[in-house]
Protein backbone atom coordinates (compact mmCIF):
# COMPACT_ATOMS: atom_id res chain seq x y z
CA UNK A 1 0.00 0.00 0.00
CA UNK A 2 2.79 2.42 0.92
CA UNK A 3 4.46 1.85 -2.47
CA UNK A 4 1.24 2.94 -4.19
CA UNK A 5 1.14 6.17 -2.19
CA UNK A 6 4.80 6.90 -2.94
CA UNK A 7 4.26 6.23 -6.66
CA UNK A 8 1.17 8.47 -6.71
CA UNK A 9 3.17 11.27 -5.06
CA UNK A 10 6.10 10.84 -7.45
CA UNK A 11 3.88 10.54 -10.54
CA UNK A 12 1.74 13.59 -9.72
CA UNK A 13 4.84 15.73 -9.03
CA UNK A 14 6.55 14.45 -12.20
CA UNK A 15 3.53 15.15 -14.42
CA UNK A 16 3.06 18.56 -12.77
CA UNK A 17 6.71 19.44 -13.41
CA UNK A 18 6.48 18.30 -17.04
CA UNK A 19 3.32 20.38 -17.50
CA UNK A 20 5.11 23.37 -15.96
CA UNK A 21 8.03 22.86 -18.33
CA UNK A 22 5.81 22.64 -21.41
CA UNK A 23 3.19 25.27 -20.51
CA UNK A 24 5.37 27.67 -18.55
CA UNK A 25 8.79 27.56 -20.12
CA UNK A 26 7.97 26.79 -23.74
CA UNK A 27 4.60 28.50 -24.24
CA UNK A 28 5.01 31.16 -21.50
CA UNK A 29 1.56 30.32 -20.11
CA UNK A 30 0.00 28.20 -17.45
CA UNK A 31 0.37 29.92 -14.09
CA UNK A 32 -1.99 27.40 -12.56
CA UNK A 33 -2.35 24.62 -15.16
CA UNK A 34 0.45 22.42 -13.73
CA UNK A 35 -1.17 22.69 -10.30
CA UNK A 36 -4.61 21.89 -11.71
CA UNK A 37 -3.30 18.73 -13.37
CA UNK A 38 -1.24 17.61 -10.36
CA UNK A 39 -4.25 18.19 -8.08
CA UNK A 40 -6.47 16.09 -10.37
CA UNK A 41 -3.94 13.25 -10.18
CA UNK A 42 -3.47 13.55 -6.42
CA UNK A 43 -6.03 15.47 -4.35
CA UNK A 44 -3.65 15.39 -1.36
CA UNK A 45 -0.60 16.72 -3.21
CA UNK A 46 -0.20 19.68 -0.86
CA UNK A 47 0.58 17.19 1.92
CA UNK A 48 3.32 15.65 -0.24
CA UNK A 49 5.64 18.65 -0.30
CA UNK A 50 8.36 19.01 2.33
CA UNK A 51 8.14 22.72 3.11
CA UNK A 52 10.76 24.86 4.83
CA UNK A 53 10.23 26.02 8.42
CA UNK A 54 9.13 29.48 7.31
CA UNK A 55 5.86 29.44 5.39
CA UNK A 56 4.01 32.74 5.16
CA UNK A 57 0.41 32.91 3.96
CA UNK A 58 -0.82 36.29 2.70
CA UNK A 59 -4.57 36.74 2.44
CA UNK A 60 -7.18 39.47 2.57
CA UNK A 61 -9.60 41.37 0.37
CA UNK A 62 -6.99 43.47 -1.45
CA UNK A 63 -3.26 44.11 -1.49
CA UNK A 64 -2.24 40.45 -1.38
CA UNK A 65 -0.13 40.51 -4.54
CA UNK A 66 1.75 43.68 -3.63
CA UNK A 67 2.37 42.48 -0.08
CA UNK A 68 3.59 39.07 -1.28
CA UNK A 69 5.89 40.66 -3.87
CA UNK A 70 7.38 43.11 -1.36
CA UNK A 71 7.97 40.36 1.20
CA UNK A 72 9.55 38.08 -1.41
CA UNK A 73 11.90 40.85 -2.55
CA UNK A 74 12.91 41.64 1.05
CA UNK A 75 13.75 37.98 1.69
CA UNK A 76 15.63 37.71 -1.63
CA UNK A 77 17.65 40.85 -0.84
CA UNK A 78 18.58 39.27 2.50
CA UNK A 79 19.98 36.27 0.61
CA UNK A 80 17.16 33.78 1.08
CA UNK A 81 15.86 31.46 -1.63
CA UNK A 82 12.16 32.22 -1.94
CA UNK A 83 9.30 30.14 -3.30
CA UNK A 84 6.19 32.20 -4.01
CA UNK A 85 3.30 32.31 -6.45
CA UNK A 86 4.48 35.24 -8.55
CA UNK A 87 2.57 34.40 -11.74
CA UNK A 88 -0.56 36.34 -10.80
CA UNK A 89 -2.89 33.61 -9.59
CA UNK A 90 -3.79 33.16 -5.94
CA UNK A 91 -5.80 29.95 -6.03
CA UNK A 92 -4.81 26.53 -4.70
CA UNK A 93 -3.59 25.37 -8.12
CA UNK A 94 -1.20 28.35 -8.37
CA UNK A 95 0.30 27.52 -4.98
CA UNK A 96 0.84 23.95 -6.18
CA UNK A 97 2.41 25.26 -9.41
CA UNK A 98 4.90 27.38 -7.45
CA UNK A 99 5.76 24.35 -5.30
CA UNK A 100 6.24 22.19 -8.41
CA UNK A 101 8.53 24.85 -9.85
CA UNK A 102 10.62 25.05 -6.67
CA UNK A 103 10.83 21.43 -5.53
CA UNK A 104 12.68 18.23 -6.27
CA UNK A 105 10.88 15.13 -7.57
CA UNK A 106 10.63 13.83 -3.99
CA UNK A 107 8.63 16.95 -3.04
CA UNK A 108 11.36 18.69 -1.03
CA UNK A 109 11.10 22.43 -1.62
CA UNK A 110 14.47 23.95 -2.58
CA UNK A 111 13.78 27.30 -0.87
CA UNK A 112 14.47 28.77 2.55
CA UNK A 113 11.06 30.43 2.77
CA UNK A 114 7.68 30.05 1.06
CA UNK A 115 5.34 33.01 0.69
CA UNK A 116 1.90 32.21 -0.67
CA UNK A 117 -0.63 34.75 -1.79
CA UNK A 118 -4.01 33.11 -1.46
CA UNK A 119 -7.56 34.14 -2.02
CA UNK A 120 -9.34 34.43 1.31
CA UNK A 121 -11.96 31.92 0.12
CA UNK A 122 -9.32 29.19 -0.22
CA UNK A 123 -7.37 29.91 2.96
CA UNK A 124 -9.46 27.58 5.12
CA UNK A 125 -8.84 24.59 2.85
CA UNK A 126 -5.13 25.37 2.31
CA UNK A 127 -4.00 26.27 5.86
CA UNK A 128 -4.36 22.73 7.29
CA UNK A 129 -2.25 21.35 4.44
CA UNK A 130 0.63 23.84 4.37
CA UNK A 131 0.51 24.79 8.07
CA UNK A 132 1.86 28.34 7.68
CA UNK A 133 4.25 29.56 10.36
CA UNK A 134 2.99 33.12 9.79
CA UNK A 135 -0.25 34.56 8.41
CA UNK A 136 -0.56 38.09 7.04
CA UNK A 137 -4.09 39.46 6.60
CA UNK A 138 -3.94 42.64 4.54
CA UNK A 139 -7.53 43.71 5.22
CA UNK A 140 -11.05 42.37 5.35
CA UNK A 141 -13.86 43.99 3.41
CA UNK A 142 -17.07 42.69 1.97
CA UNK A 143 -15.94 42.98 -1.63
CA UNK A 144 -17.31 39.69 -2.90
CA UNK A 145 -20.47 37.70 -2.27
CA UNK A 146 -20.10 34.80 0.21
Where are these regions (language model features)?
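Phosphate-binding loop of NTP-binding sites
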Residues: 2-146
